[in-house]
Amino acid sequence: MYKKIIAKVALNKNDSGFTPYKYDLNVYRGCEHNCSYCYAMYSHKYLDDDKNFFNNVYFKENIAEILNFELSKKSWKHDLIGFGTVCDSYQPIEKDLKLSRKCLQVMLKHKNSFYMSTKSDLILRDIDLLKEMSKQFPISLALSIITTD
């Protein structure tokens, strides 16, 4: 089930010291990929929905507009952003909503580096943006492949 939420912020500060990025950007909360090794299920407890991480996917309808506002601030230092750190940014519904694509367009506009991982081939839809970004500033993509063994 998909549930719309309105984002108050796009970027969340990550001061754990365990990651190379200082800010997280999560377009979705919850994940239909249902990976057995998922480390992000804890994030649903903040939505009072901790038993339904793989069934209820929340999408932040206004995320691109908020991201554009935050990256436009004079105080923004172009820190590295972890894009989709709590769940995959290419959920099946992304094909219709295009929220991650809109966020990529904002990142291109502001020339802001990011790290993203996905297991979805839907990332190929955005290869035009990713190619253009890689010509202008550093980006890092990690792709996982599902196997049966």
Regions found by a protein language model. Give the residues of each.
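Conserved Radical SAM active-site core
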Residues: 1-28, 32-142, 148
